[in-house]
Amino acid sequence: MQQQHLFRLNILCLSLMTALPAYAENVQAGQAQEKQLDTIQVKAKKQKTRRDNEVTGLGKLVKTADTLSKEQVLDIRDLTRYDPGIAVVEQGRGASSGYSIRGMDKNRVSLTVDGLAQIQSYTAQAALGGTRTAGSSGAINEIEYENVKAVEISKGSNSVEQGSGALAGSVAFQTKTADDVIGEGRQWGIQSKTAYSGKNRGLTQSIALAGRIGGAEALLIRTGRHAGEIRAHEAAGRGVQSFNRLAPVDDGSKYAYFIVEEECKNGGHEKCKANPKKDVVGEDKRQTVSTRDYTGPNRFLADPLSYESRSWLFRPGFRFENKRHYIGGILERTQQTFDTRDMTVPAFLTKAVFDANQKQAGSLRGNGKYAGNHKYGGLFTSGENNAPVGAEYGTGVFYDETHTKSRYGLEYVYTNADKDTWADYARLSYDRQGIGLDNHFQQTHCSADGSDKYCRPSADKPFSYYKSDRVIYGESHKLLQAAFKKSFDTAKIRHNLSVNLGYDRFGSNLRHQDYYYQSANRAYSLKTPPQNNGKKTSPNGREKNPYWVSIGRGNVVTRQICLFGNNTYTDCTPRSINGKSYYAAVRDNVRLGRWADVGAGLRYDYRSTHSDDGSVSTGTHRTLSWNAGIVLKPADWLDLTYRTSTGFRLPSFAEMYGWRSGDKIKAVKIDPEKSFNKEAGIVFKGDFGNLEASWFNNAYRDLIVRGYEAQIKDGKEQVKGNPAYLNAQSARITGINILGKIDWNGVWDKLPEGWYSTFAYNRVRVRDIKKRADRTDIQSHLFDAIQPSRYVVGSGYDQPEGKWGVNGMLTYSKAKEITELLGSRALLNGNSRNTKATARRTRPWYIVDVSGYYTVKKHFTLRAGVYNLLNHRYVTWENVRQTAAGAVNQHKNVGVYNRYAAPGRNYTFSLEMKF
């Protein structure tokens, strides 16, 4: 904050002006001793800003570790809570699949940590079971936020900075170093955080240790997390729910009597037939349970989830005596588990399902007959894989996901604060990173209510069933990076030049394994009674002449479903794609005096891939990306900004592998997706704060979708070849983005210093969607990835010394636009039909959040937040989007949408300690 003070001439000033020269003359005459004062150095750690990489800062958001703490960011959904225009993509099983920005999501938004690309969203093409459609996880590994020094979010094409994937934007994380924990002037530092989040009963415990002895230094961060599912508003799950369950009742037929041989201890058929049992048939019985225990499409609550995360980061290093040279290493391991049960799958059989299965399977031997008094033993039908399943057991569908990331590397850093050599900054690094997503699907039918994930079929549980399916997807990178920065002047023009180089050897591997089922049978046979006084007996099931059957202990049968080489989902042949890539980028941000800043960047990327499978669409891609920006400064309080940039996304590993339908397919040529971004803004700035408004235009082309090549034959459109991933679509969007922060003390110095207000707004509009004429069986691009227009208004106070602060935030979201969910599908016969992404869209909603902090003796900071203060019931589009056709694991068969309700009033607390 700057203030202007007017100098007023008065009697006191005149007296001092008159006296001081005389006093100075007397001192000089007395030849007083001169005294050299000690030089005072003030050091401050450089904070990352929006304009570090690109001169305009348009579309950029930067969050430091302090910002993450203040906003109480504990997971990926908290990171962008108050940032309109960027949203989390829900994976459908508790995990996430990256971010959505400007109408694109998942692999079209780059996600990197220290320049290392994180795993791609890889979705297998066929259903595992239950109500989810993806064979593999489809998730993107999440970042441990306690390891993060800063995160830069870029909205709009950004491949010149982040390479492939930055088609619509990028999210780049930077890892902490020892300096971020060691306080100024100290040789060691300890930081601890304990946090609790009420929305998911999440508990976080993190501790960071750092020390420096001579030139040696090290940092160790250990973080553990445990949480459940995000709980819906209490009103959404209030009450009880009822359902039908198949129960055994006596068969009314007069030909439904039987006796069991093993139960006739004292005689044969003639003696035992006096006490026959009756066959059972199924009849629906109404049952009522709590909303938490209910299973079925009308479930009110979200699926139960158990989430755990364990992470550690170790960064040792040595800084040489002149402090210009640093050599260090990095070791990181993070493992996250997401264990959930799909409770939209009914646990119990109903008469309708039972009869339908019976009709399809035909007559089943022994149906209706049971041993002892266990009537449920007589109710069974044909289930999945034609295995018999009994009505007495409940069905459970479970997804266990384990995400494991390991990284180790070396780095050399050269820093020249004097800026008197060829480089002000240079960094050379080598990293080896491996990320694996282990997705295990289990379907059980062997416990009373289906809740036991660990039950298995056994001989004493006839008609019990178990199915397993496991898909493990992994990616590895061996990345060598070099970065150089230099500032210099030419003809009174300031240049900030940077050069970046990189070389990567990478691999992608998908393993399909543990794909089998187990089924418990029972021994059953229809017996012929022995002759009675030489007369043959022929039972007919009547009460006086019941059937004579044998029911004994059965066995468990295990069948492998895995096949090899059949080119369908059951194909368990490992998939591997390997390759290499390199890039070279140069950027120069130029200051043209006080009136203008100009920046431009250029990047060249090369990627080559190969596979042992000749039907994989591998190949070589060469791409050129660029950006340019200008800031005009006609006044101290005004900036006029404009930038343009390009982006691209290379075909993903899943797209290269292709769509397999059983036939031998041929590799196809897939070009990179391309984007072009234009953005113009105006910035008002001063002691009052700043306010930025911008307009953007994003054009996408060569979007990759699954479909067929089309050809005209005999005047009619016909398909050509097999289904494949092809470049087929283009689209264009425009929008408005507003950001602002007001310092009220700067507006009027009578107001308290530290009082501020913030404002953010984002709106996106779809302008154009096109399909290539030589493509068919193509779904038009549905913009379900666009976040509804959103306003975020805040006001808060930070005590000038940082001892305490409080903040209130109002978030208002408009309804989801129906036009963004409507599209059409080009059919094989040349016609088209209208389509809709999902059956529901969200209504407008608003919430109020309040948070604050208090620091005790500079070492302890207590933070607390009340979210959805007014306990408003609402549903976010990000949650409902899990039912959309483009969802990673689409939620199907959804009867009610209560389960997508956001949390009601909830609380977050954290205690931070720094020494």
Swiss-Prot record:
A motif (TonB box) lies at residues 38-45. Residues 526-545 are annotated as: Disordered. One of its GO terms (molecular function) is siderophore uptake transmembrane transporter activity. Its main location: membrane. GO terms for cellular component: cell outer membrane. Keywords: Cell outer membrane, Membrane, Receptor, Signal, TonB box, Transmembrane, Transmembrane beta strand, Transport, Virulence. Residues 187-915 form the TBDR beta-barrel domain. Residues 526-540 have a biased composition (Polar residues). Residues 51-176 form the TBDR plug domain. A motif (TonB C-terminal box) lies at residues 898-915. It is a multi-pass membrane protein. InterPro entries: Plug_dom, Plug_dom_sf, TonB-dep_rcpt-like, TonB-dep_rcpt_b-brl, TonB_box_CS, TonB_Hb/transfer/lactofer_rcpt, TonB_lacto/transferrin_rcpt, TonB_rcpt_b-brl_sf. Residues 1-24 form the signal peptide. It is found in: Cell outer membrane. Gene3D superfamilies: TonB-dependent receptor, beta-barrel domain (2.40.170.20), TonB-dependent receptor, plug domain (2.170.130.10). Neisseria acquires iron by extracting it from serum transferrin (TF) in its human host. Acts as a TF receptor and is required for TF utilization. Binds both apo- and holo-TF, via the TF C-terminus. Binds both human apo- and holo-transferrin (TF), via the TF C-terminus. Forms a large complex with TF and TbpB. Belongs to the TonB-dependent receptor family. This is Transferrin-binding protein A. It comes from Neisseria gonorrhoeae.
